Amino acid sequence: MKHPKRPVIRSTTVIGVLRDGKAALGSDGQMTLGNTVVKHSTRKIRSLYQGRLLAGFAGATADAITLLDRFEEKLEAYNGKLERAAVELARDWRTDKYLRRLEAMLAIVSSERALIISGTGDVIEPEDGIVAIGSGSMYALAAARSLMKHTGLSARDIVRESLETAAEICIYTNNHIVVEEV
């Protein structure tokens, strides 16, 4: 339960795209506290499991880092099996008293899979190979779907263009963009 007077640290757009055997994941760099931008170049993308996976987060930064650490532990325990590690993290997140309070979401991509892990314990694998989380996610998702359908752009370029579109619309998204690829 959120404390009603506690300012919420939020803002972000993270989007991942699978295309032609490659995966790209990118984010903007803005972090806000309440209605104030406190940082423009926050890094929200991490390389995991010997560079085979990329993970991005939206939500409270400390909470997201905690979840990423747990997810890395699960990856090691399950020999890099993305789906199994994601399901086990979601199970823990849903049942553990401490983890249940964490306010974040994760977007994870490999060259073959794209998943969203939510705080409600859901593991979502979109049919179109596009994952998007954060305040500008719907703008970026719409742009990515259109670019996938109507262009031959690479996964990396689709992610970058989608984030640029979100930055033009969403006040919690900026154009300090980081894109990584596996």
Swiss-Prot record:
One of its GO terms (molecular function) is threonine-type endopeptidase activity. Its main location: cytoplasm. The keyword Hydrolase applies. InterPro entries: ATP-dep_Prtase_HsIV_su, Ntn_hydrolases_N, Proteasome_sua/b, Proteasome_suB-type. It catalyses: ATP-dependent cleavage of peptide bonds with broad specificity. The active site is at residue 12. It is an enzyme of class 3 (hydrolase). SUPFAM superfamilies: N-terminal nucleophile aminohydrolases (Ntn hydrolases) (SSF56235). One of its GO terms (cellular component) is HslUV protease complex. PROSITE patterns: PROTEASOME_BETA_2. Na(+) binds at residues 167, 170, 173. Allosterically activated by HslU binding. CDD domains: protease_HslV. GO terms for biological process: proteolysis involved in protein catabolic process. Its EC number is 3.4.25.2. The keyword Lipid metabolism does not apply. A double ring-shaped homohexamer of HslV is capped on each side by a ring-shaped HslU homohexamer. The assembly of the HslU/HslV complex is dependent on binding of ATP. NCBIfam families: ATP_dep_HslV (TIGR03692), PRK05456.1 (NF003964). Protease subunit of a proteasome-like degradation complex believed to be a general protein degrading machinery. PANTHER family: ATP-DEPENDENT PROTEASE SUBUNIT HSLV, METALLOPROTEASE TLDD. HAMAP family: HslV. Belongs to the peptidase T1B family. HslV subfamily. This is ATP-dependent protease subunit HslV. It comes from Chlorobium luteolum (strain DSM 273 / BCRC 81028 / 2530) (Pelodictyon luteolum).
